[in-house]
Amino acid sequence: MATSLSEPTKKRILQVCVKLFLEQGYKKTTMAEIIEKSGVSSSSFQNIFRAKDGVLTELVQFMFENQFSMARSAASVKLPPVYVYAVETAIQMTLTELNENLREIYLEAYTQKEACEYIQKETAKELYQIFGSYQPELTERDFYELEIGSAGIMRGYMAHPCDAELTLEKKLRLFFTMSLRAYNVPEEEIGRVIRFVEGLDIRTISEQVMQK
């Protein structure tokens, strides 16, 4: 756990990690490289993050907060919360098509236990707020269990790069159809959500997220 005194060190390590992960990939980046380029001692790194997967969990937290923030801005406060979910997941999936090393980061995040649990638990809280009215009999725990399944769908699509037949637009339509049906969203509303996202410049929005 980082203290207030270690916050500048933590920030410096994270900045170095983002640069290295995007340039050469998560798996190819070693702890030795991170420590050297951050200018910190091995003990300082381990006190804050324990290991490289600790950095990944921290980055995942930042990325998800940023994605939901951008999604809320793109969806506007006037639209139902389901649109925020659609834009957030569209951003996430689009990011993996913009940068192969970013694809690796997300896939690793959905694979490593600590990072994956963070994703599922935090997403479940959002899902409960967004979809609770569609299935009022379900608890937040129920939505956590549903998220385990929808996260698996998300990971599957992220792991499969787009091609001439499976375009990004088609991938998003398929994901929305499956996930929103699981949350009991009416078919007509699913159609409206899909058309809304297709009307956005989702690649530009995702690039803005990546720059942050």
Question: Where are the model-predicted features located?
Answer:
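Helix-turn-helix
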Residues: 12, 20-54, 58
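Hydrophobic alpha-helical connector segments
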Residues: 58, 69-102, 122
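Hydrophobic/aromatic residues within well-ordered alpha-helical segments
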Residues: 59, 63, 67, 88, ...
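Secondary-structure edge/capping motif, primarily at the C-terminal ends of alpha-helices
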Residues: 71-75, 103-106, 157-165
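Short, hydrophobic secondary-structure boundary micro-motifs
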Residues: 103-108, 188-192
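Amphipathic alpha-helical packing segments from all-alpha helical-bundle domains
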Residues: 109-159, 170
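C-terminal peripheral helix-coil segments that are non-catalytic and often amphipathic
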Residues: 129-133, 159, 163-212
